[in-house]
Amino acid sequence: MAITKDDILEAVGAMSVMELNDLVKAFEEKFGVSAAAMAVAAAPGAGGAAAAEEQTEFNVILAEVGANKVGVIKAVREITGLGLKEAKDLVDGAPKPVKEGVDKAAAAEAKKKLEDAGAKVDVK
């Protein structure tokens, strides 16, 4: 006699959380799959446009230094906490990221400080 889908559902429904955990591990081992990988694979189909609208991490990029290089170096030091040499190297290497993975408010604040110093800034 073959086991039906309903029989399997009844058996799974009667299992405790620990038994279900063991069952999932057994499936992963037997079939060479991962329950986590399936969840990740389903996420991209959710819509890339919605993810772009809800961006939570931003990168502040120093695009151009402008005429006031000293002021920009001071602003970079204030924003990043870098030493004078490191800040100067960052400014000389523009375009370069000043801050990465910051929230929207921190990115806006950094952009304002750099623009007030005369730099051209991109937030991505």
Curated annotation (Swiss-Prot):
GO cellular component: cytosolic large ribosomal subunit
One annotated GO biological process: translation
InterPro entries (UniProt xref): Ribosomal_bL12, Ribosomal_bL12_C, Ribosomal_bL12_C/ClpS-like, Ribosomal_bL12_oligo, Ribosomal_bL12_oligo_N_sf
Keywords attached to this entry: Ribonucleoprotein, Ribosomal protein
Record flagged with keyword ATP-binding: no
One Gene Ontology term of the molecular function aspect: mRNA binding
Function (record text): Forms part of the ribosomal stalk which helps the ribosome interact with GTP-bound translation factors. Is thus essential for accurate translation.
Family per record: Belongs to the bacterial ribosomal protein bL12 family.
Protein name stated in the entry: Large ribosomal subunit protein bL12
Organism: Cupriavidus necator (strain ATCC 17699 / DSM 428 / KCTC 22496 / NCIMB 10442 / H16 / Stanier 337)
Gene name, Swiss-Prot/TrEMBL: rplL
